[in-house]
Amino acid sequence: MQYYRWAVSTFSFLFIFSITALSNANAATLTGKVAFQGTAPPAQIIKADADPRCKLMHPNGIAADEVIVNPNGTLKNVFVYVKEGLAGKTFEAPKATVVFDQKGCQYSPKVFGIQVNQPLEIVNSDDTLHNVHALPANSQPFNLGMPIKGMKIKRTFTKPEVMVKIKCEVHPWMRAYAGVLDHPFFAVTGGDGTFEIKDIPPGQYVLEAWHEKYGTTTQAVTVTADNQEIQFQFKA
């Protein structure tokens, strides 16, 4: 699958989602997509020559991943979540572990969501030194050197924050972002630009879409048992 990257400040994309009621306790599922409008420029290539093992895996360089436009005209790596409307509600941290890997001299996933106090397992799948330097403002920062292939370390974030930047000083092209929330209502757009957020109770909410390059956009929405479609549009 071929991706395109955007490297300038002008942009245009369309954020669309619909609300479909579930029969289970009146909860709803949010589905939608983030679409890019305009002509995508050629990809930028980053040389990996400084690390021989990275160069071996990427002899022609690594494609920059700050902005990825999918073949169907949608945007990848947009974090979508409920920003307002859950006051007074509490949600237990999941026991399921979120895995954050260093593979092919890149972070995977690039953008992810995790709940407060949910286990985060950090893995090095490469036979080279990486470090994971997380820079939260609300939780304790950490900087982990991981020189051994197969090495695993667990950490947690203790306070909500959108977004937490993660970087590797050894390989400066490696950047990732974690959306840390005290609820489970979030998703990240993938290779088709779509997202799905399940089991949202009826009510009035503010949803936010975050992108590494383009920042944030929000819109108020009323979740009911009726199907709905809402659009966010950005133009250069």
Language-model-detected regions and their locations in the chain:
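Bacterial N-terminal signal peptides
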Residues: 9-21
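Extracytoplasmic copper-binding redox domains, predominantly the cupredoxin/blue-copper superfamily
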Residues: 22-236
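N-terminal secretory signal peptides that target proteins for export/translocation
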Residues: 1-8
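Short, intrinsically disordered, low-complexity terminal segments
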Residues: 4, 18, 22-25
